[in-house]
Amino acid sequence: MLLLATLARAQQAPQKKDEQAPPEEDEALVPKEYSFNPLQASKELKVGNYYFKQGKYRAASLRFLEATRWDGTLVEAFLRLGEAREKQHDRKGAAEAYAKYLELAPDAKDAADVKKRLAKIKK
């Protein structure tokens, strides 16, 4: 009898649920927004250099790409991105990275060497 009374009361009382509105879109699918952050770019560059030295060129190129997104003027990241993509036999990607490097630093010490690499890739 006591059990029936408890069940009846439970049915009568409205239950409050933790109602959360579902997200309007999957946050994993939302593109990441980048703002100028030279510290994060420097970190990504360091990690990319580590991966490059380990021979993990795909991981390195992803880190160098992240560095260029955080700081679009970080010329070393574009150079290293070109080198990593070249190691992966991604000629188009390497050419794009080298071209951007030369656009940002046309008077760099190694600009002539990068121009030679770029010409070799485009052949």
Model-identified regions with their sequence ranges:
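TPR/TPR-like (Sel1-like) alpha-helical repeat modules
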Residues: 89-109, 116
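Canonical tetratricopeptide repeat
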Residues: 80, 113-117
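Alpha-helical segment of the N-proximal tetratricopeptide repeat
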Residues: 37-70
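Helix-start (N-cap) detector for alpha-helical repeat units in TPR-like alpha-solenoids
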Residues: 41, 75-76, 109
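Long, contiguous interaction/recruitment modules in multidomain scaffold/adaptor proteins
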Residues: 1-37
